[in-house]
Amino acid sequence: MLGGLLVLCGCSPKSMPDSDLIGLKFVSSGTMARPEFEGSVRMDSAGVFVLKAMKENYGPMFEKQITAEDMKHFREIIEDEKMYKYKDSYRPRMQVMDGWGWSFWAKFADGSVIESHGSNARPDGNGLGKVHGYMEQLIQDGKQIEFPEE
């Protein structure tokens, strides 16, 4: 019965993709001009996963190759924290104009994509915090690729 209702309204239940995670991005921003934290993982032309992220808030970008096992760990976070159920957008009930926001994107080998963002509101759980924390942990021995102007 529920399945029939979902088909009629054009909705589909959100479920975890069955394929491997091949890309990931998390950005949080405050009231400053640049992101508070930014991290992304992409597969390069040689099939190697490359993490680009900040070691600290508002810091320069660093780069590091990561393993397929690291990508499996990110995938486990997404699954365990049910991040695949995130709404497209999160906003508070009352308008807040302080500029704080975040965005999350994950791509899987079968073409599935999870995308979500928010302004002054976020989903329940600690999925975003765990993704952020694991990116920071991995990038600590990365090579600096962005140099602030002095």
Which residues does each PLM region occupy?
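Sec-dependent bacterial lipoprotein signal peptides
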Residues: 1-9
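Post-signal-peptide N-terminal segment of Sec-exported extracytoplasmic proteins
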Residues: 31-57
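Short, low-complexity, polar/charged sequence segments that are solvent-exposed and flexible
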Residues: 42-48, 60, 70-71, 123-126, ...
